[in-house]
Amino acid sequence: MTMTDPIADMLTRLRNASAAKHETVDMPYSKFKANIAEILKREGYIKDFTAKEAKVGQTLEVTLKYGPNGERSIQGIKRISKPGLRRYAKSDSLPMPLGGLGIAIISTSSGLLTQKECLDRGIGGEIVAFVW
């Protein structure tokens, strides 16, 4: 069976693994997912990620990050633009999740960026997800 929204699947796996206090989570690999993982690592939401060879294709292994008392670094993660309803924003109307405490991942012509990077460059794009 084919997956309709592999990005939503990735975000759900991260949300569930974080809630269950798992150390790592595996998912099917794609460049887009690796770019999302790169942003999450750069912003401090995950420890690391690696691409591994599997029986069929590759898998993306994400190492989750927790605080000193076991508190989750990913409190919430939500898919915004979905296959049935795409959401776009101009550079002057980009969202600020939780008043700037979270990040919005934006797909632009320059690749995946956070809303802060989009504001600096003055570009808009498709709002992929919110993370806080």
From Swiss-Prot:
The keyword rRNA-binding applies. One of its GO terms (molecular function) is structural constituent of ribosome. GO terms for biological process: translation. GO terms for cellular component: ribonucleoprotein complex; ribosome. The keyword rRNA-binding applies. Keywords: Ribonucleoprotein, Ribosomal protein, RNA-binding, rRNA-binding. InterPro entries: Ribosomal_uS8 (IPR000630), Ribosomal_uS8_sf (IPR035987). Gene3D superfamilies: 3.30.1370.30, 3.30.1490.10. Part of the 30S ribosomal subunit. Contacts proteins S5 and S12. NCBIfam families: PRK00136.1. Belongs to the universal ribosomal protein uS8 family. One of the primary rRNA binding proteins, it binds directly to 16S rRNA central domain where it helps coordinate assembly of the platform of the 30S subunit. This is Small ribosomal subunit protein uS8. The gene is rpsH.
